Amino acid sequence: KAEIEYLDKDYAAAMESFKHLQAVAENPENKEAAKLGLMRCAELTGQPQEALLAANDLLKEPKLSPEIMSEARYVRAKAYISLKQENKALADLKEISKDTRTIHGAEAKYLLAQLYYDNKDDKNAETVLMNFIENGTPHQYWLARGFILLADIYIRQGDDFQARQYLTSLQNNYKGDDEIAAMIEDRLGK
């Protein structure tokens, strides 16, 4: 029932069903599935406190696959950020950003740099972004966001020439159909 509600995008109902499943499940696989479903529903319905609790609960499971562990750390990090507890997100972001081949890893790398930038730690933000650029990712959106953040760092440091170089290169090479073009235009217009 919970799976069907989840697939129908009725996340509030699915959340209740997953809570019920978690309470009555007897085998470890069903308990884990319930915890995973609960965590995903909490994240998708914008409930960071619930997502945090569910992620922590899921991470206590002894036999999680690396993918599920990474997803749980990602959800936990995003929940901490939403709850304005960024410092608690750092360890998870550092761990999952080691593998930028995954969508969570790519976003985590960007978020890690963004947190450093927000805390006026340009040196660490730049180091994270240079590592991201060097290692690459198939997730071009997050790499583009990384280039824009790198340009923001250079702008803040007064190196407008370097910032413009990155932004112009990104403008010429990024093919995505999203807000990246507007972000570039906004910065080049200043």
What are the roles of these predicted feature ranges?
Residues 1-190:
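Acidic, polar-rich low-complexity tracts and alpha-helical solenoid repeat scaffolds
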